[in-house]
Amino acid sequence: MDLEEQKKAVIEKLIREGYIKSKRVIDALLKVPREEFLPEHLKEYAYVDTPLEIGYGQTISAIHMVGMMCELLDLKPGMKVLEIGTGCGYHAAVTAEIVGEDGLVVSIERIPELAEKAERTLRKLGYDNVIVIVGDGTLGYEPLAPYDRIYTTAAGPKIPEPLIRQLKDGGKLLMPVGRYLQRLVLAEKRGDEIIIKDCGPVAFVPLVGKEGFQG
């Protein structure tokens, strides 16, 4: 099977297994070429549903995890989304496909080399609705706040206060919490109240920063 056939096969499998359901998420995963975000020696593994090393101690998330996170966040066209942990840019591209031209993805990456490479790939593929910023993602990005949705691609000890502040009322935040025994947590902001839902066990790299783990 060529890469396109492998992509269709893995997405059909994820639909059968219940990880992805909505047309928006399915279409986005079909559209984004995961291989473009990988180092040359890993391109042939682009549609193996597993995390892959991308350098600097970081990974690209498994395809099912990206799809599941998009479903849990209930992303919609026109939304402004904050992503903490750009990595190679794949997750940002999938999010950008869903929010569309009228939406915006603001992605923060603490490792300059990864940010630069991700931005190059995103530009090459035409994702002009993604802004990549080098910085401490645990502090969010105040200049473009508030956000409809926020998610992190790394696990922190708790949800950082700056991210809660930068979330719109009615907005949703999704992040893995914990160091070794991690849980994926969905938080919804309702006025001064934060409603927390546990979405199950996960395994992510640590979220490093002032409001995260110390690097």
Curated annotation (Swiss-Prot):
Domain of life: Archaea
SUPFAM superfamilies in the cross-refs: S-adenosyl-L-methionine-dependent methyltransferases
Compartments (UniProt record): Cytoplasm
GO (cellular component) term, any one: cytoplasm
Matching InterPro entries: PCMT, SAM-dependent_MTases_sf
GO process annotations (BP): methylation; protein modification process; protein repair
Molecular-function GO terms, alphabetical: protein-L-isoaspartate (D-aspartate) O-methyltransferase activity
Alphabetized UniProt keyword annotations: Cytoplasm, Methyltransferase, S-adenosyl-L-methionine, Transferase
One matching Pfam family: PCMT
Catalytic activity: [protein]-L-isoaspartate + S-adenosyl-L-methionine = [protein]-L-isoaspartate alpha-methyl ester + S-adenosyl-L-homocysteine
Annotated catalytic residues: S61
Entry's EC annotation: 2.1.1.77
NCBIfam families: pimt, PRK00312.1, PRK13942.1
PANTHER family documented for this protein: PROTEIN-L-ISOASPARTATE O-METHYLTRANSFERASE (PTHR11579), PROTEIN-L-ISOASPARTATE(D-ASPARTATE) O-METHYLTRANSFERASE (PTHR11579:SF0)
Family stated for the protein in its record: Belongs to the methyltransferase superfamily. L-isoaspartyl/D-aspartyl protein methyltransferase family.
Protein's job: Catalyzes the methyl esterification of L-isoaspartyl residues in peptides and proteins that result from spontaneous decomposition of normal L-aspartyl and L-asparaginyl residues. It plays a role in the repair and/or degradation of damaged proteins.
Protein name: Protein-L-isoaspartate O-methyltransferase
Species in which this protein is naturally found: Methanocaldococcus jannaschii (strain ATCC 43067 / DSM 2661 / JAL-1 / JCM 10045 / NBRC 100440)
Gene: pcm
